Amino acid sequence: MSTSSSNGLLLTSMSGRHDDMEAGSAKTEEHSDHEELQHDPDDPFDIDNTKNASVESLRRWRQAALVLNASRRFRYTLDLNKEEHYDNRRRMIRAHAQVIRAALLFKLAGEQQIAFGSSTPAASTGNFDIDLEKLVSMTRNQNMSNLQQYGGVKGVAEKLKSNMEQGINEDEKEVIDRKNAFGSNTYPKKKGKNFFMFLWEAWQDLTLIILIIAAVTSLALGIKTEGLKEGWLDGGSIAFAVLLVIVVTAVSDYRQSLQFQNLNDEKRNIQLEVMRGGRTVKISIYDVVVGDVIPLRIGDQVPADGVLISGHSLAIDESSMTGESKIVHKDQKSPFLMSGCKVADGVGNMLVTGVGINTEWGLLMASISEDTGEETPLQVRLNGLATFIGIVGLSVALVVLVALLVRYFTGTTQDTNGATQFIKGTTSISDIVDDCVKIFTIAVTIVVVAVPEGLPLAVTLTLAYSMRKMMADKALVRRLSACETMGSATTICSDKTGTLTLNQMTVVETYAGGSKMDVADNPSGLHPKLVALISEGVAQNTTGNIFHPKDGGEVEISGSPTEKAILSWAYKLGMKFDTIRSESAIIHAFPFNSEKKRGGVAVLRGDSEVFIHWKGAAEIVLACCTQYMDSNGTLQSIESQKEFFRVAIDSMAKNSLRCVAIACRTQELNQVPKEQEDLDKWALPEDELILLAIVGIKDPCRPGVREAVRICTSAGVKVRMVTGDNLQTAKAIALECGILSSDTEAVEPTIIEGKVFRELSEKEREQVAKKITVMGRSSPNDKLLLVQALRKNGDVVAVTGDGTNDAPALHEADIGLSMGISGTEVAKESSDIIILDDNFASVVKVVRWGRSVYANIQKFIQFQLTVNVAALIINVVAAMSSGDVPLKAVQLLWVNLIMDTLGALALATEPPTDHLMHRTPVGRREPLITNIMWRNLLVQSFYQVAVLLVLNFAGLSILGLNHENHAHAVEVKNTMIFNAFVMCQIFNEFNARKPDEMNVFRGVNKNPLFVAIVGVTFILQIIIVTFLGKFAHTVRLGWQLWLASIIIGLVSWPLAIVGKLIPVPKTPMSVYFKKPFRKYKASRNA
């Protein structure tokens, strides 16, 4: 039997490509140049999609160029050695489990003298008549003889004091007793890194280690020459600043680690249905206990070890345990079920016999430490950018080092008192070493500032922040890269049922007895025989349930939304659910199949009568019918009425109703296979059916969906509906949701049936896919074909899905979005993001957050590169011209702290704005630094460099310091430069918030963290300048100089407005940078 999926269907949608963007601008005429740049096959940092990338491709870029401080740089990215280790571990997972099992049994044998293979009756465990170790051993070893010894599944259930039909009691005390006796369904997790491990990793930065060595050397020389009281200041201040950077880095990393750990815990907390006290209730997987009866459906994860009570066509995918992609059929001959496996086909009920650490899955999970590391395309590109900038910074630092040493040893440098620092034959060795250490420290500190370590941190911060906030917006991120990829989505292929609609279904129209019923659920006009057949077909051909509370309260109906609607309708017709199920038995079932759009059961009445009941898509079931039962209970030929029923189906579909037909037929008992093996292979007859009823089910559109679709359209994201429903129903819902704007649009291929699409050639599908807005009567494979066609056209595709058979499309799409409520565990595991409320509006929020991730990273890049450029030019020019630098080592470390940690924290946590949804999608290969960013950072950098260099060379006269002591005047001037430089960065943080907007303050009140960080930075700067003079090489400034510093920083605001009036070329700057290299490479290859 083919693998089937649950009732929900997926939708797929995509739009035209928007490859090139300029902070959200449209495509340009110079597209060819840009496209040529984007598809550079030799670019080691060009990995546009890491979703299914191999370890080899991810390793390639790490080895492609010199990488500074690799151990620290890559602390946020995937550990490829660990990934390979886990792959090997998974391949040997079965052998690993067997070793653990043998060790456990050996331990138990030693401690409790339990003999292997013993047939001694089990000792009791608490109030239960079965021993925990024997129960666990039976299930793990899949020992049929032990199972028979206990009296089969029924005997085990009795010993566990559980009812195979109603489960255990709902009493909380009983659940606690079972946890005490048999354990809980949890397992001990390996401890993650503690804070000290993060502290050690932060310490691994090569430049910081060099600075510490320089600080220790300076400390020793200083104490030796100047004494302890004054001599410790230079070296001690550098050492303290380095330690501060290390601690702040470790704290930041540790916080992000805890956040990701909490999100991982959310991912593992599966919600599932169990039978307790005869009713179906939803609980956490952690609350499953031994004795629970759990219904299993296609796509479910087996939540614990157990044995099969009953099932039909039940097939289990055990690859997660065995490492082999093999589907294993389960029946009474092979009833053992292993935790962690997936239901590939069929339905069944299981009795839980082992939970948590007492299962193989629990032992494996406890023994394997889960790593949250994952490579994202943005991290790859940022590390490439950071490496390039780091190499530039290293080169500049070497130039400065050589220049300072040359100037020093040629006697052209002076100390603060104006005296020549080096005089051959006069200057002592200790002074020379001390001066050289200071020079070396300056060069190393330039590297610290130049190497943008904050870029990877900014990615981690913004991803962690976004993931936490997306949880509040009902989206659980399973794969980090999906956050940023969602910002590039050009099309969303959305399911209809439950995503665009409420998934709250009711039967509002019924055709039965050959005519339309006046009241959909009033049986007065129907013959009892017809009502009886409808009732039997509904009661038996369902995975739902009806529970009658003992206190006489309202009836509780469980199952999928469609089944609940039909069960409720049949109950009102007079269906006796429990009676029907007790008087007849299902001998074979064909679970609902999303390919065939129908499901059926063979029911044995008494000893000789067999009825086959079918339920499914109305027009498909109708096509299989040759008769219908009229209101008198007699059978009539359907030929004369077929057109009437077709018109009825079309009419209901146009009113956005889902049409479901119920039909049956009789079957001679001698034509039913006798042996179970033959019965499992038996294909239920689906011809010569008798039509019993057609129902129209209303599933209202979700409030807010129309607005969400409008937002997507204005954001350049095409929404497409892909549904298994009738094309007319799909069209009606699409019009209601705004996916189709008018009836005139509803022509092929804008709306198309899945069958028509799948019969096209591959080239034709690619052409047609661009135009499709609605696809009706589609199968999961049709959705996969649509996704493939759209991706070949260059679209970045997001797909929603909930069924097991949707897994290939979810995996193929750039972003797979599974449904948290209606989605199967198989679909969730194949997806990148889980939409917790199944709401399309939440999908749109994910798009906003995806764009926000990219935008926040760009804000931080603009801010950090401005600091990099300004600090480098100021120190290099000053060093080359005067032999000294105005920004000292400790000061640059403080600036580094502002940039790398505080700046990243402030800008990476900017919430998304409506402005983001007025842009077209971010191009998959759009340059990280856009022309707008280049303009902004160059304007600010040139301003800062100009002002601060003027202060450096003419500051004494400008500030009126000529009449003061020269050494003190130089200290005041340098302090002023440092203070003004920091003020520029504080005010420029506001500019970085809005790279392409005039009003940089818009929404600042919505980010209190940003305001707090700016305030804290300002206060700390006051403390450093005013109270930590000896430590930071500063002196106190008067209020006039403070005001001047603030004004210098404040000028960056009007300057930013003026700068934004400067037009920028449409061709990305990176094209001009790369063209000479490409031409050189081409000439060499020629």
Curated annotation (Swiss-Prot):
Instruction: Please provide the Gene Ontology terms (biological process) for this protein.
Output: double fertilization forming a zygote and endosperm; pollen development
Enzyme class (EC, first level): translocase
Q: Where is the composition biased (Basic and acidic residues)?
A: 16-42
Q: Please give the Pfam families that the UniProt record associates with this protein.
A: CaATP_NAI, Cation_ATPase_C, Cation_ATPase_N, E1-E2_ATPase, Hydrolase
Q: What GO terms fall under cellular component here?
A: membrane; plasma membrane
- Which is an annotated GO molecular function term of this record? P-type calcium transporter activity
Bias kind Low complexity: ranges: 1-15
Among Gene3D superfamilies, the record links this protein to: 1.20.5.170, Calcium-transporting ATPase, cytoplasmic domain N, Calcium-transporting ATPase, cytoplasmic transduction domain A, Calcium-transporting ATPase, transmembrane domain, HAD superfamily/HAD-like
Q: What SUPFAM superfamilies does this protein's entry cite?
A: Calcium ATPase, transduction domain A, Calcium ATPase, transmembrane domain M, HAD-like, Metal cation-transporting ATPase, ATP-binding domain N
Binding-site residues, Mg(2+): D802, D806
Q: What does this protein do?
A: This magnesium-dependent enzyme catalyzes the hydrolysis of ATP coupled with the translocation of calcium from the cytosol out of the cell or into organelles.
**What does the domain comment read?**
The N-terminus contains an autoinhibitory calmodulin-binding domain, which binds calmodulin in a calcium-dependent fashion.
Query: Per its record, how is this protein called by name?
Result: Calcium-transporting ATPase 9, plasma membrane-type
Q: Could you tell me which species this protein originates from?
A: Arabidopsis thaliana (Mouse-ear cress)
Task: Cite the source lineage.
Answer: Eukaryota, Viridiplantae, Streptophyta, Embryophyta, Tracheophyta
